[in-house]
Regions:
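Aromatic-enriched
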Residues: 32-33, 327-344
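Short glycine/serine- and small hydrophobic-enriched flexible loop segments
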Residues: 88-91, 187, 325-328
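ATP/nucleoside-binding phosphotransfer catalytic cores, i.e., glycine-rich phosphate-binding loops
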Residues: 313, 317-321, 325, 339-344
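Primarily membrane-embedded glycan-assembly and transfer machineries that use lipid-linked glycans
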Residues: 5-166, 191-313, 320
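Transmembrane helices and adjacent periplasmic/lumenal helix-loop junctions
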Residues: 171-189, 308-318
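Short, Lys/Arg-enriched N-terminal segments with co-localized hydrophobic residues
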Residues: 1-3
Length: 344
């Protein structure tokens, strides 16, 4: 019913009511946080959150952010210094409360972003149901990616509403947390006030970049930025190892595993795909059209996962809002239904 209808009609069915959806989404966030915390071995079920939470203490004690700390968590911290500073509220709360609120924040912000997309209500409702399962997967891993895609959606929404300063700030924040926010720059040509947007972007990037220096000092924070780039390069090397079945779940990774060639370069796929995307994007007469903007939004959300060596099951929430937008905007043909079902 949700996916086949474009209008609510006179009725307001339970599955489309704002209060029902809000309760469901925030409830899912709180419940998954509580569930993962309540399981016996804490580090094995909320490990990602432990990494995020511990980064605050490491930063303010001026410890290296990016080595392994096996007594605290496993895996590596892969986020920028600004993220460590912003984890302050969660670091001071008791662990149980903080992980519940973390998941609630991720779920709530993504819900609120989708609900504010410039689309008819039934389309927004359909997208919320389409992405719910992948959101739960991300929440069960206490990941950041639901909040990350919410920030990207909000950077578009705010740009579309003319609030260019806030849009630019969110793009900058996304870049300096985990680079994914860079795709928000795809919305640059959708505003007529590009000069003002450019100024906001410059100031936004400068402000977010400089923010950690206020707390860590120049020498230590600069070292953190250098080590961040190094660990991302190291992580990419680990991701493309064909013996690692968890990550590199992208187009390039698929071909690396099919051919058994772990040295297959990403450029063979990135260059032609970026050229094709640019050909689709650079249609200036369509930049002001809402339908075109939404389709580009869907494109960049899906593309970032298809082309990232860091793609794994919990990160797919980054792409699924794009899948939802793509599906609801098009005619519900058998082909579209087939691709949609295959994607799910």
């Amino acid at each position: 019913w949700i996916l086949m209808s474009d209008k609510l009609g006179k009725s307001n069915p339970w599955y489309a009511r704002f209060n029902v959806l809000l309760f469901l989404w925030v409830g899912v966030g709180f419940f998954t946080g509580w569930k993962q915390y309540s399981l016996s071995e804490v580090n094995s079920h909320i490990n990602n959150f432990q990494i995020f939470r511990s980064s605050f203490g490491h930063f303010f004690q001026q410890m290296h952010l990016y080595p392994l700390y096996p007594k605290e968590y496993f895996d590596l911290y892969l986020y920028g210094p600004v993220f460590a500073v912003l984890m302050a509220p969660f670091a001071y709360l008791p662990l149980g409360w903080s992980v519940v609120l973390w998941n609630g924040l991720n779920a709530g912000m993504l819900f609120w972003a989708v609900w504010n997309l410039p689309m008819v209500r039934m389309h927004r409702v359909a997208i919320l149901w389409i992405i719910l399962n992948s959101t739960i997967t991300a929440l069960l891993n206490t990941q950041f990616h639901a909040l990350c895609v919410a920030m990207i959606l909000w950077s578009y929404i705010l740009m579309q509403r003319g609030k260019l300063g806030w849009s630019a700030l969110l793009i900058a924040l996304g870049v300096f947390i985990k680079f994914y926010g860079i795709i928000g720059l795809a919305f640059f040509f959708f505003t007529k006030d590009r000069l003002r947007y450019s100024v906001y972007l410059v100031f936004g990037f400068a402000a977010v970049f400089a923010f950690p220096f206020l707390f860590g000092g120049v020498e230590y924070t600069w070292l953190c930025y250098q080590e961040w780039l190094e660990v991302l390069s190291h992580k990419n090397t680990l991701n493309v190892d064909i013996r690692n079945l968890r990550t590199d779940v992208c187009v390039m990774g698929m071909f690396r595993r099919i051919t058994g060639d772990g040295t297959l370069s990403n450029l063979w796929f990135l260059v032609p795909s970026l050229c094709l995307s640019a050909w689709v994007y650079f249609q200036p007469k369509k930049w002001a059209l809402l339908d075109f903007q939404l389709r580009i939004l869907a494109l960049v959300l899906i593309y970032i996962m298809l082309a990232s060596t860091g793609t794994e099951s919990p990160t797919l929430i980054m792409a699924f809002p794009g899948v939802g937008i793509w599906f609801v905007l098009g005619e519900k043909s058998r082909t579209r239904w087939g691709w949609f079902v295959l994607t799910l």
